[in-house]
Amino acid sequence: MQRTLQLGDVQVDERSLSDLCGRYRVRELSLFGSAARGEMRPDSDIDILVEFLPDSAIDLVDYAGLMLDLSRLLGRKVDLVSKNGLKPLIRTSVLAEARLMYAA
């Protein structure tokens, strides 16, 4: 039976998301921005915060691949942001509104 995860304006098949995250060694994936707040417009992208498992050796090709695969899965352009790369100025607000989509 297919289980769907609904977070704000984003709906995704849980099994597909879990498989994708496992393939890319994702520790946590969270939604933030307009989609998390329920304020998406037809032209909005989806902002996603990612944290990889500590032993992951993710390079730029893998990062771009994850972003593309998430875009395909969600049916929209995805803006993928590394949790470790968050600028101090926005870190608190992003983490406050982040809605967990996946955790390993």
What are these regions (language model features)?
Residues M1-E28, R37-P42, L53-A104:
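Catalytic core of pol beta-like nucleotidyltransferases
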Residues L31:
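Conserved histidines in hydrophobic membrane contexts and catalytic metal-binding motifs
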Residues S34:
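Catalytic DNA-binding helix-loop module of base-excision-repair DNA glycosylases/AP lyases
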Residues I46-E51:
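Short, aliphatic-rich beta-strand segments
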